[in-house]
Amino acid sequence: HALAAFGHDRAGPGTPFVGIEAPVVPPPEDCPRFRDGPPAEVDWPVRPPFPFWAEVLDGRAALGHAPWDPEPRGAAENASWMRFDQPPHDGAGAFDELALLVVADMMPGSVFEVMPYRPDESSWFAPSIDLTVHLRSVPSGEWILTHNIAHWLEDGYASAECRIWDLHAEHGPQLCAWATQVMLFSERRR
């Protein structure tokens, strides 16, 4: 099931503000590409090409770890640069902001920051129970930054939020979308 509510710009009281800040991350060209996959010496159940990353999005890890990296981790947080290979456009030729729904549904990576992959253990997958996305603005350039933060993981469920940023907007970083997700965390046997 899907529920959508649409609105348009309108005048309102108060001074506009965004009460969160974009993370400070390296530029996309300095970040590892998801398309390249894990190094050959890493025991990872899937090898490139990964169809989604090879055919739809160029994703690059800007904050956090690659899923196959077994190193100890810190906060349940990650950020990734994303660029569509063929940017979706609406009928008028403008970037279709509904495409942001695709990148908003990548929050499980923030949970994996606190539960790293171990080749001798089961892997996990996390289908959505609830995904709510608030679209705010259309990105101005080809690269957008997703910043994901997990809030809790317990009893087979997890909750996270995603902030989608345009760091190259004319007047500084601009929040393009904000999303929340509750996911079912399940074990997948190898």
Q: Can you annotate each of these PLM segments?
A:
Residues 1-190:
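Terminal targeting signals and extreme-terminal segments of soluble enzymes
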